Amino acid sequence: MSDKIGLFTGSFDPMTNGHLDIIERASRLFDKLYVGIFFNPHKQGFLPLENRKRGLEKALGHLENVEVVASHDKLVVDVAKRLGATFLVRGLRNAADLQYEASFDYYNHQLSSDIETIYLHSRPEHLYISSSGVRELLKFGQDIACHVPESILEEIRNEKKD
């Protein structure tokens, strides 16, 4: 029997404790879980890709079966095929997330019918945490320590120094 390989993607700009919770839970479901940082090279991100990748690798270092990868200008299903992943993992906070994700699931299934999407519901304590919300708090100088892993906080602080 072949290994169960999953792929969880996002921009992780920045990674939140909600992302971390989904990744930790998903890592128990798969032999190998890839965490893919997907980004649009034509958009200005909050944190540079290198900082995001380094922060995620530190935050996920305790998970032996998890590997962080980065991609741009590629479809998720193409990256999944390249990595041998047959499952896409998505986190859901609310009904709006489900509706948003359902359209991607439709297209992904059209492009690769052998790849399934697995949905994990956010824990109640993470329902209202989002990367955009964290960026908004930072914009106004607010403390975000309770919303992001320590390694992400370090990357944000280091980026502000530069």
From Swiss-Prot:
Homohexamer. It comes from Streptococcus pneumoniae (strain Hungary19A-6). One of its GO terms (cellular component) is cytoplasm. ATP binds at residues 11-12, 19, 91-93, 101, 126-132. Keywords: ATP-binding, Coenzyme A biosynthesis, Cytoplasm, Magnesium, Nucleotide-binding, Nucleotidyltransferase, Transferase. Reversibly transfers an adenylyl group from ATP to 4'-phosphopantetheine, yielding dephospho-CoA (dPCoA) and pyrophosphate. This is Phosphopantetheine adenylyltransferase. The record marks 19 as: Transition state stabilizer. It catalyses: (R)-4'-phosphopantetheine + ATP + H(+) = 3'-dephospho-CoA + diphosphate. It holds the Pfam family CTP_transf_like. Its cofactor is Mg(2+). It is found in: Cytoplasm. Pathway: Cofactor biosynthesis; coenzyme A biosynthesis; CoA from (R)-pantothenate: step 4/5. GO terms for molecular function: ATP binding; pantetheine-phosphate adenylyltransferase activity. NCBIfam families: coaD_prev_kdtB, cyt_tran_rel. Its EC number is 2.7.7.3. It comes from the Bacteria. CDD domains: PPAT. One of its GO terms (biological process) is coenzyme A biosynthetic process. The gene is coaD. Belongs to the bacterial CoaD family. InterPro entries: Cyt_trans-like, PPAT, Rossmann-like_a/b/a_fold.
